[in-house]
């Protein structure tokens, strides 16, 4: 089990202090609902060594090194523990000579998003659906004052805490295992990221409103999601699965997505990137035993999913509250 009290202390004197009215009780309830694997996963973090990195790079990667390299045996023990937390989906991480080669090259997405962002220096940042926290560390690397990630998945919390322990227990990033719908409206974050979440929502406009409720006035929303070609009235609603995912509900065109954001009261809305997901960005690795993108596409025509829908294409939209 993880101790969230250091986070409570961090936010007690910040603009997030109002969150303390609800958060401690919510996390106590969350702990009561965790399943047996969570206990096993959380104990793995205890088995990881207490290492002090002499060099940490969060600006160009998520990387930690010591002046004296670890022995082969030490590296193998760490790899053994980290592989018990598979699958590792978002990365990569480079920790003491260990390359955690995750399913997603999330650094590709970060390179696409970063040039368009309002500078993160000294900003309070929220990352919704943060997974194991790869992008959170990159946000810290850009100078964010504090990054809060929310994701209810127990495995992601354990992966995040494992990486944090190997990054000198850096407290500038914190993962809270809740969903956005469980957060009270704080209107406290300078930048809010929602990347790879919107299409999993049965009510996408509610999700956009929830994101808006966490932003300060004129704060920046960074929205990355699946899109399809089409006009302002085009939205794909898969009948069953999309790319073998059963929880995909709405995939709009870029113009439809901009219309949704306008309807929710955002302004200064602009699409800064559209990219088809490539096989070099999402693929099988030794850190993932599951299927990956190649298995989700039509083997005869990679421009379509295995169900016959357009292959995954992702847009990055920026907007202000």
Swiss-Prot record:
What are the UniProt keywords, alphabetically?
Answer: Transferase, tRNA processing
The protein's matches in InterPro entries, at most eight in alphabetical order, are given as:
CmoB, Mo5U34_MeTrfas-like, SAM-dependent_MTases_sf
Output the CDD domains linked to this UniProt entry. Answer: AdoMet_MTases (cd02440)
Q: What class of enzyme is it?
A: transferase
Q: How does the record describe its quaternary structure?
A: Homotetramer.
Matching entries from NCBIfam families are given as:
PRK15068.1, tRNA 5-methoxyuridine(34)/uridine 5-oxyacetic acid(34) synthase CmoB
PANTHER family under this entry?
METHYLTRANSFERASE, TRNA U34 CARBOXYMETHYLTRANSFERASE
Q: Please identify the protein, giving its name as recorded.
A: tRNA U34 carboxymethyltransferase
Source species, please?
Histophilus somni (strain 129Pt)
């Amino acid at each position: 089990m993880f101790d969230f009290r250091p986070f409570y202390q961090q936010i007690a004197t910040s603009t997030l202090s109002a969150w303390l009215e609800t958060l401690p009780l919510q996390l106590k309830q969350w702990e009561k609902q965790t399943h047996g694997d969570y206990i096993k996963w959380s104990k793995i973090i205890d088995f990881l060594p207490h290492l002090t990195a002499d060099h940490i790079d969060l600006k160009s990667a998520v990387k930690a090194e010591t002046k004296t390299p670890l022995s082969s045996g030490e590296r193998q023990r760490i790899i053994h523990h980290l592989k018990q937390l598979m699958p590792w989906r978002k990365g990569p991480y480079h920790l003491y000579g260990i390359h955690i080669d995750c399913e997603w090259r999330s650094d590709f997405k970060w390179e696409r998003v970063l040039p368009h962002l309002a500078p993160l220096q000294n900003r309070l940042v929220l990352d919704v659906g943060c997974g194991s926290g790869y992008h959170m560390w990159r946000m810290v690397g850009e100078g964010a004052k504090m990054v809060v990630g929310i994701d209810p998945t127990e495995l992601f919390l354990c992966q995040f805490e494992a990486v944090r322990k190997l990054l000198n227990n850096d407290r500038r990033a914190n993962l809270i295992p809740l969903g956005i719908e469980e957060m009270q409206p704080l209107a406290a974050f300078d930048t809010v990221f929602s990347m790879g979440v919107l299409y999993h929502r049965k009510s996408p406009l509610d999700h956009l409103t929830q994101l808006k409720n966490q932003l300060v006035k004129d704060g920046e929303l960074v929205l990355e999601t699946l899109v399809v070609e089409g006009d302002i009235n085009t939205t794909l609603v898969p009948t069953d699965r999309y790319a073998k995912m059963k929880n995909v509900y709405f995939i709009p065109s870029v113009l439809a997505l901009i219309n949704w954001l306008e309807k929710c009261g955002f302004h200064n809305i602009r699409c800064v990137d559209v990219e088809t997901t490539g096989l070099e960005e999402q693929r099988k690795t030794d850190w993932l035993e599951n299927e990956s993108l190649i298995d989700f596409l039509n083997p005869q025509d990679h421009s379509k999913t295995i169900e016959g829908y357009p292959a995954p294409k992702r847009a990055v939209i920026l907007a202000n509250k």
